[in-house]
A protein has these predicted regions:
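Membrane-embedded transmembrane alpha-helical bundles that form the catalytic cores
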Residues: 1-419, 424, 429-469
Length: 470
């Protein structure tokens, strides 16, 4: 099940919401309801993986209790923590990277081990990282071990965030398990945020993505340089509205049930450097790698060379987290390279060149998205070659307008304006418009977004989140 599917919108969510409201002032009962709902949500598509989720919950609950019994930073505590991390990474590694490493072994040894093609359980990267952050912060003494297994289960399985995040921290989530408010105002804000997210996903990402798919479905020899540029720009819009749309829906759902889920985006395409881009894009992942990999490796405390090495490791891991292919590793390496270059001194130059720094950042991100979308390094480089020398590739049996329809053009314009330009303009030139927030006009707008999105979903334009594959 997905939070943008018709079964979720018309059956699952209304039923769970009504039952939650019937549990008046009974937080423990609400938690049990939400846990059961989350397990049903997770098991809906492929029930077999509910066992994996329950094993992960039980393992991390037990390891947490064991870790909580050790003295701070003792050898025993470090051993338990290391074992816990290995258990989590072992589960993730088997499902996500087994075939990847088997291919490497085959190439190095000349063997012909058969690929297992292991299906990837939904949300495994997200709940695994959530579990590791729980254990590491417990080891650091940020809180006591969770004694209630139901609380641990709800933290890892909470249905708004389990599929595509954000990656919630236990220290932020745990207090809300026993003390949260379900007010009319918070519920209304949640519905508003959910409506915006649903509209971003269904009305913008899906429509723009259809044209992206058409272009990339062509044989590469039949794609002009202009088409590749167009596809790159459209995909940048698609992935932002797809992922941030799901994040908005998750945050909105959380508020509807009294929870505050962390923000994950802050208009990343307004960034003037790659460093800034990663402070605005997938914030919960970048901050996770900062806190649980970069800083433990030494951060920037052990000299420049070590800092650059640590950054390289972090972005290698970032690429690998997204997928077990050389393309995703190359995508991570691309971002890591430019962040290191900026740290070496290029950032000072960027600060002096005004608007050009946004052009630089946009180009790096666009080339990265080509690698990310194609997900295969060799053809991705062929597409990039066409972008760099578009005048050499002008022949195609298709006109661009055959691949990019009117709806896509309209949503592209709306998408570009909605990536921070409209918001910045309203804040600067029309601050009074902020007072309309929560008013009748916004209510009508939200109702329109939900109705239009559901109409498209009914007509068969449902598509899962891009990040559902990670």
């Amino acid at each position: 099940m997905s939070i943008n599917s018709m079964i979720f919108l018309t059956a699952f969510l209304p039923v769970v919401f009504v039952l939650d409201r019937l549990c008046v002032r009974k937080t423990a009962l609400k938690n049990i309801l939400l846990l059961l709902a989350s397990l049903v949500f997770y098991a809906w598509g492929d029930p077999v993986y509910i066992v994996l989720l329950l094993v992960s919950i039980a393992a991390n609950y037990g390891i947490g209790l064991l870790l909580g019994c050790q003295r701070d930073e003792s050898v025993a505590a470090k051993t338990v923590l290391a074992a816990g991390i290995l258990v989590n990474l072992g589960i993730l590694g088997y499902y996500k990277y087994f075939d990847f490493f088997l291919r490497i072994v085959n190439r190095l040894t000349g063997s012909e081990h058969e690929m297992r093609n292991i299906p990837l359980p939904i949300g495994i990267s997200f709940f695994t990282f959530g579990a590791i952050s729980y254990l590491m912060d417990l080891y650091r003494g940020h809180y006591e071990a969770e004694k209630n297994p139901l609380n641990m289960a709800l933290y890892l399985s909470f249905f708004p965030k389990i599929s595509v995040g954000p990656i919630a921290r236990y220290r932020d989530f745990a207090p809300q398990l026993t003390n949260r408010q379900e007010t009319v105002e918070k519920t209304a804000e949640g519905i508003r945020r959910f409506a915006y997210g649903l509209g971003k996903k269904v009305l913008v990402a899906n429509i723009v993505g259809a044209s992206v798919d058409k272009i990339y479905a062509q044989d590469i020899t039949n794609v002009t340089g202009v088409m590749v540029w167009c596809a790159a720009i459209l995909y940048a819009i698609q992935i932002y509205y797809d992922f941030s749309g799901f994040t908005d829906m998750a945050i909105g759902l959380g508020k509807m049930f009294g929870f505050d889920i962390c923000e994950n985006f802050n208009y990343p395409y307004l960034s003037g450097s790659i460093q800034e881009f990663w402070r605005r894009w997938h914030i919960s992942l970048s901050s996770w790698f900062r806190d649980y990999l970069y800083i433990p490796l030494g951060g920037n405390r052990k000299g420049k060379a070590r800092t650059y090495l640590n950054l390289a490791i972090v972005f290698f891991a970032t690429g690998l987290w997204h997928g077990a292919t050389t393309a995703f590793i190359a995508w991570g390496a691309l971002h890591g390279f430019f962040i290191i270059v900026e740290r070496i001194g290029f950032k000072k130059i960027l600060d002096k060149i005004g608007f050009l720094r946004y052009v630089y950042t946009g180009l790096v991100v666009l080339f990265g998205w080509v690698i990310f979308r194609v997900a295969n390094l060799r053809p991705a480089l062929q597409y990039i070659r066409r972008m760099l020398t578009p005048w050499q590739y002008t022949q195609s049996t298709y006109a661009l307008r055959e691949l990019v329809g009117n709806r896509c053009i309209v949503m592209t314009v709306i998408g570009i304006l909605g990536m921070g330009l409209i918001q910045a303009g309203i804040k600067k030139f029309c601050p009074a418009a902020e007072k309309l927030k929560g008013g009748v006009l916004e209510l009508v707008y939200c109702m329109f977004l939900i109705a239009a999105s559901m109409l498209l979903l009914v007509n068969g334009t449902y598509s899962p989140a891009i990040y559902l594959n990670f």
